[in-house]
Curated annotation (Swiss-Prot):
Disulfide bonds: 27-85
Lineage, broadest ranks: Eukaryota, Metazoa, Chordata, Craniata, Vertebrata
InterPro entries: Ig-like_dom (IPR007110), Ig-like_dom_sf (IPR036179), Ig-like_fold (IPR013783), Ig/MHC_CS (IPR003006), Ig_C1-set (IPR003597), MHC/Immunoglobulin (IPR050160)
GO CC, one annotated term: plasma membrane
One matching Pfam family: C1-set
Keywords recorded for this protein, A-Z: Disulfide bond, Immunoglobulin domain
Keyword Disulfide bond set for record: yes
Protein name: Ig lambda-3 chain C region
Ig-like domain location: 6-99
Presence of the UniProt keyword Disulfide bond in the record: yes
Length: 104
């Protein structure tokens, strides 16, 4: 089975959620093979371990996909310049960043 590096897509928190003082970031990890991935989150480059929830990979068309969620408060979301979802797969590291300033 050929190796396929994951594609990352980041979704910011919804405005409705922010009004409730919550912020959930979603990192969609898709089109990878084999299924082993390690997900790490960072805020301004500093690793975050609390509030992280990563799904088990599911198979779709011979490739795998997974999602990772980062649960924050809206204050935490606004108080950082960038959030990064970093995925390690078969020795390769792929990362995608999201900036709260771009999502206002």
């Amino acid at each position: 089975q050929p190796k396929s590096t994951p594609t990352l897509t980041m979704f910011p928190p919804s405005p409705e959620e922010l009004q409730e003082n919550k912020a959930t970031l979603v990192c969609l990890i898709s089109n990878f093979s084999p299924s082993g991935v390690t997900v790490a989150w960072k805020a301004n480059g500093t690793p975050i371990t609390q509030g992280v929830d990563t799904s088990n990979p599911t198979k779709e068309d011979n490739k795998y996909m997974a999602s990772s969620f980062l649960h924050l408060t809206s204050d935490q979301w606004r108080s950082h310049n960038s959030f990064t979802c970093q995925v390690t797969h078969e020795g390769d590291t792929v990362e995608k960043s999201l900036s709260p300033a771009e999502c206002l």
